[in-house]
């Protein structure tokens, strides 16, 4: 665990230990290993990450110049955990882990305020938006694949980046638009065959 949700894990462990004295499960501390040393960030992305593709027309004085394509990888989480978290558990703020994620992708960490009719939501946001951060994103997720439908989004996202390299001709742009039109919430067909390669070993 790397986030304030370690409090929920410890609470569950205490509950189990109180009801079964056969074996006492220890409460471990936060995982402080490098982010690229394991698949934790992939799991975190399956829950709170998002890949996006933007296609828009550039204009100057109302005159069309060219069509541009941008790709983003974004992680956004609320600023604070809903329960009290002790200092030994890392505290209740997500600032530390989101700062670490932003530094890993060599981008800045931003705050976001979103208002509804009766509530205000505060979040931390890290966005990989340039070639350097995209290279790190791809290297990581190629090493530690996603398990959810975001794996499919990631693969399409990579295809768009590859098509965008060099000159953007009509054929490439048409392919990008086709991918975008069935991306994320617009996707109708899902292929989870990547899960066939998962190996679950039972350790006795």
Q: What spans do the regions from the language model cover?
A:
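Internal intein/HINT superfamily modules and their associated LAGLIDADG
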Residues: 1-204
């Amino acid at each position: 665990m790397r986030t304030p949700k370690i409090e929920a894990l410890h609470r569950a462990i205490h509950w189990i230990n109180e009801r079964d004295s056969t074996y006492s499960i220890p409460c471990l501390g936060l995982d402080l290993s490098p982010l690229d040393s394991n698949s934790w960030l992939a799991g975190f992305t399956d829950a709170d990450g998002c890949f996006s593709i933007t296609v828009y027309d550039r204009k100057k004085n109302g005159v069309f110049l060219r069509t541009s394509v941008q790709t983003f990888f974004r992680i956004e989480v609320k600023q604070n955990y809903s329960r009290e978290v002790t200092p030994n558990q890392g505290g209740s703020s997500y600032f530390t882990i989101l700062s670490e994620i932003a530094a890993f992708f060599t981008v800045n960490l931003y705050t976001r305020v979103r208002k509804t009719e009766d509530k205000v939501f505060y979040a931390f946001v890290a966005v990989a938006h340039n070639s350097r951060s995209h290279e790190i994103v791809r290297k990581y997720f190629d090493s530690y694949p996603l398990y959810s439908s975001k794996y499919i989004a990631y693969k399409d996202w990579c295809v768009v980046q590859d098509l965008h390299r060099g000159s953007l001709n009509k054929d490439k742009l048409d392919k990008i638009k086709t991918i975008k039109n069935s991306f994320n919430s617009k996707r109708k067909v899902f292929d989870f065959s990547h899960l066939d390669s998962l190996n679950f070993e039972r350790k006795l």
